[in-house]
From Swiss-Prot:
The keyword Zinc does not apply. Binds 1 [4Fe-4S] cluster per dimer. It catalyses: N2 + 8 reduced [2Fe-2S]-[ferredoxin] + 16 ATP + 16 H2O = H2 + 8 oxidized [2Fe-2S]-[ferredoxin] + 2 NH4(+) + 16 ADP + 16 phosphate + 6 H(+). The gene is nifH. This is Nitrogenase iron protein. One of its GO terms (molecular function) is ATP binding. Its EC number is 1.18.6.1. Homodimer. The keyword Iron applies. Belongs to the NifH/BchL/ChlL family. It comes from Rhizobium leguminosarum. One of its GO terms (biological process) is nitrogen fixation. Pfam families: Fer4_NifH.
Length: 47
């Protein structure tokens, strides 16, 4: 089984974390990265 990969995006609300994570995933698929288990975490900074 392939090793688990993790990517995290952090920043203030409204900065585009969800868009960035979706674009990153689309780029990986577009570049034919082999299927690997992956966790994408999206978090915000506390005010």
């Amino acid at each position: 089984m392939a090793a688990l990969r993790q990517i995290a995006f952090y920043g203030k609300g409204g900065i585009g974390k969800s868009t960035t994570s979706q674009n990153t995933l689309a780029a990986l698929v577009d570049h034919h990265v082999p299927r690997i288990p992956m966790i994408i975490r999206i978090g915000g900074y506390a005010q």
